[in-house]
Every structure is written in C-alpha cells, then in structure tokens.
C-alpha cells in the first residue's frame, strides 16, 4: 500500500461531502492508501460540524447544492475542492488512455453511449462513466484505450485539475434554475469545460448559434462529408434530425482522434439508441406508446415532439419537477404536433401557467392517472408520448423508474 498524493502533494486528511454512489466510489478507492484519514459528511448536520480548515482536500458529490446553506461556505475553500473525476484522472494521467468529456442539456447521453458503442464495435477497449450512471473510480482497475465521460454542469463546477484530451459542449438550453441564478450562469458552467480540455468544440446550433460541424452537413435526412453521402437516418435505428446532429458530433470526435470514419459509420448503423429515450414500447389497436422518460427538460421534449411525427396526433404526458424550466418555448411544437396534454406532478400548476393558452389539457393526480386518461382518449394512428420535460423525483427514484412504470402500464393494457 502507498500514501495518497494529489498533484504531487501528500494528502493526510480528506473530507467526503455526500455519500451516494459517487461518495461511496471515492471512499472505496481511498481505502487502498495508508496514512490517509477520510471523514464523511452524509447530511447537513454532519457538514455543519466539520472544521473545513483541517482538511488537505475536500471531495464533493455533484448532488450537493453549492448555492444553498450550509454548503455555500465551500466557496471559501475552492482550492481544496476536487471531484471524483479529478481523483480518477490523477490515477490514469500517465497512461496512454484518452479521456473524452461531453456535456450539454440534451443529447449528451445519446452521444456518449454511441461513442462507447462504436469504439467497442471497432475493437477498442472503452469505458463509459460519469453522469450517465457509473462513477469512474469504479472502473479504476480496468484497462482501456478510451474513457468516455458524460459530465454535468454540477460536476464541472467541482473540477480542479482534470485534463480531458477532448471536451465537447452540445445543445445548452434552459435547465437547473434551482441551482443557477440564470441561464447565462448555467451556460457558462457548461462552457467552463474548455478550461479542463486539451481540445474543445461546441455544437449548439439551436440555442447559441454556435455550430462546429467540421466537414459534415445534413441534407434531407442524410449526413454528407463534403459531397459524399455517409448515411441516411433510415439506415439507422434512430429517428429525427436531432439524432443526425448527435451523429455529426460523434464523427467530429472520431476525426480528432484519427479514427476511420467509414468503419465508424458502419457501427453507428447498428446502434440501437438509449433506453427511455424516444423508445417505442408497443402499438395497441393502432395507438403507439412511446417512452421518452429521459426527456427531463423542455429542450429534450421539444426535440422529441419535433422528431416522432409529422401530424398533430400526439397525446402528451407532461409534468414532474420543473426545475424552473421555460415552457413557453414549447408553443410551436405543441401547436403543430400535440392534440392533448395530460398534466401531472409537483409543478403542474407552474407548467399550466405557461401552456394554458397553447393547447387543450387536463390536470391529473399523478402519472398513472395521466396515463389512464391518455390511453382512454387515444384513437387509431395517434401516439401516447411520455416526455415529461421535468425531473421525476416527486414520484419516482429517477427517470428510469418513471419509464419502467410507463412501460408496465402499457403492458397491462388489454
């Protein structure tokens, strides 16, 4: 066993703030070192009783709200704060492995999952970690060529010294106003990824006007490189122009690492997409049920509405924890594609204030009630879409459980 060093400084005492999956992964990793004392703050009372001056390092879980009491005091100890991703980087930085980071409001999970899938399909050893669910320190013992990291703004706010080989920001839209003062502060948090990346680009045509497409362009549902057609959306298991944009981001990343694009395109055609993201569950009596539970903000739901139909035939299940989202942005998509909205969840009245003049709707008790009413209303050739544009924590443990409940309700239909 060895002593623990961070940036060539021996660490004797460390505080772990938060003990969810990230905190546990940090503590499990640090248990391998000698001469290191680790204290754990699991709740507000624990934290209040901590003398922050005594610690060499403070590792903070991304779920800790730095903008709220009692955690605001951490801003005075910024030089001591590190993320679990910083600790991971310290352990692998002298290897040949490449680290790729992707952040954004929408699209990032699809992009990182596609990256990991294609790399593996092409024979590279790849690990997929970060905000998508697996803490990187849980993979510390594995050998890999590429480490694909989905990072949230909360994680970027905690970065200390990590250096990604490539960082990418995609599709920043209004979100998490429960953690940020305004959209500009949230967007800047995302863009701060550039400070921790050797190479960096932004692909965000919808919201900032910035779009680095390299040599790629979308023409009538197909991706071209210069004048050569690479693939059509119908050749993939995906749908919607937003997924063509996701593919362009992936191809640009591969270009920067010198990876064969023709082989990458062949692998992309096999990629089946994300669970709970515009996933067709079943067609019953002509009604198609689609699970887009991963649509946890307004931008994601707009992308879903704009991609799955060309008619006004969607019955939408909308609601949950709104996180300060601007639902007025949905006006065009609601008018064009949505026949009826069933509104539910903690912030249903908040959302109602935005959409009451945009569409026909009904307030429901909860998601199950909304589903029951939607399934009764739906007719042949219509779509019942769960795309809540909200977080799920008022009713569920996360978007995955919400999606699973939706699928179970569909399965129970006669």
Swiss-Prot record:
Alphabetically ordered keywords of this record: ATP-binding, Cell cycle, Cell division, Cell shape, Cell wall biogenesis/degradation, Cytoplasm, Ligase, Nucleotide-binding, Peptidoglycan synthesis
Please state the pathway this protein functions in, per its UniProt record: Cell wall biogenesis; peptidoglycan biosynthesis
Recorded catalytic reaction(s): these are: UDP-N-acetyl-alpha-D-muramoyl-L-alanine + D-glutamate + ATP = UDP-N-acetyl-alpha-D-muramoyl-L-alanyl-D-glutamate + ADP + phosphate + H(+)
Q: What is its main location?
A: cytoplasm
Q: What class of enzyme is it?
A: ligase
The subcellular location is: Cytoplasm
Q: Does the keyword Ligase apply?
A: yes
So where does ATP get bound? 104-110
Give any single GO term for biological process: regulation of cell shape
Is the keyword Repeat in the record? no
For molecular function, the Gene Ontology terms on record are:
ATP binding; UDP-N-acetylmuramoylalanine-D-glutamate ligase activity
Quote any Pfam family the record assigns: Mur_ligase_C
Q: Which GO terms describe its cellular component?
A: cytoplasm
SUPFAM superfamilies (alphabetical): MurD-like peptide ligases, catalytic domain, MurD-like peptide ligases, peptide-binding domain
- Which Enzyme Commission number(s) are listed? 6.3.2.9
Its biological purpose is as follows: Cell wall formation. Catalyzes the addition of glutamate to the nucleotide precursor UDP-N-acetylmuramoyl-L-alanine (UMA).
Give the family this protein belongs to, as stated in its UniProt record. Answer: Belongs to the MurCDEF family.
Family annotation (HAMAP family):
MurD
Q: What is this protein called?
A: UDP-N-acetylmuramoylalanine--D-glutamate ligase
């Amino acid at each position: 066993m060895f002593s623990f060093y961070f940036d060539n400084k021996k660490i004797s005492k460390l505080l772990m703030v938060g003990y969810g999956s990230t905190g546990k992964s940090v503590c499990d990793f640090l248990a391998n070192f000698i001469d290191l004392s680790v204290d754990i703050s699991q709740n507000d009372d624990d934290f209040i009783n901590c003398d922050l001056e005594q610690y060499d390092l403070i590792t903070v879980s991304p779920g800790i709200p730095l903008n709220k009491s009692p955690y605001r005091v951490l801003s005075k100890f910024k030089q001591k704060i590190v993320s679990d991703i910083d600790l991971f980087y310290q352990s692998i930085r002298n290897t040949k492995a490449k680290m790729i980071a992707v952040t954004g409001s929408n699209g990032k999970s699809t992009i990182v999952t596609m990256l990991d899938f294609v790399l593996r399909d092409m024979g590279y050893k790849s690990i997929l970690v970060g905000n998508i669910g697996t803490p990187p320190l849980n993979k510390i013992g594995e050998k890999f060529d590429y480490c694909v990291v989905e990072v949230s703004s909360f994680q970027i706010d905690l970065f200390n010294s990590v250096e990604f080989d490539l960082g990418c920001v995609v599709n920043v839209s209004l979100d998490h106003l429960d953690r940020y003062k305004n959209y500009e502060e949230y967007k800047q948090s995302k863009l701060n990824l550039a400070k921790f990346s050797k190479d960096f680009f932004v692909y965000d045509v919808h919201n900032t006007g910035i779009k680095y497409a390299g040599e790629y362009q979308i023409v009538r549902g197909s991706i071209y490189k210069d004048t050569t057609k690479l693939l059509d959306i119908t050749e993939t298991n995906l749908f919607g122009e937003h997924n063509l944009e996701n593919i362009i981001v992936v191809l640009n990343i591969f270009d920067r690492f010198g990876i064969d694009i023709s082989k990458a395109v062949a692998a992309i055609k096999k990629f089946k997409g994300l669970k709970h993201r515009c996933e067709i569950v079943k067609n019953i009596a002509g009604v198609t049920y689609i699970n887009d539970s991963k649509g946890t903000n307004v931008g994601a739901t707009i992308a879903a509405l704009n991609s799955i139909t060309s008619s006004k035939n969607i019955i939408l299940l909308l609601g949950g924890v709104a996180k300060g989202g601007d639902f007025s942005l949905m006006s065009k998509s609601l008018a064009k594609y949505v026949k009826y909205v069933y509104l539910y969840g903690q912030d249903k009245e908040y959302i109602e204030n935005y959409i009451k003049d945009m569409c026909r709707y009904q307030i429901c008790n909860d998601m199950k009630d909304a589903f029951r009413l939607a399934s009764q209303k739906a007719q042949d050739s219509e779509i019942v879409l769960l795309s809540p544009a909200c977080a799920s924590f008022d009713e569920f443990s996360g978007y995955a459980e919400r999606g699973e409940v939706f699928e179970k309700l569909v399965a129970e239909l006669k």
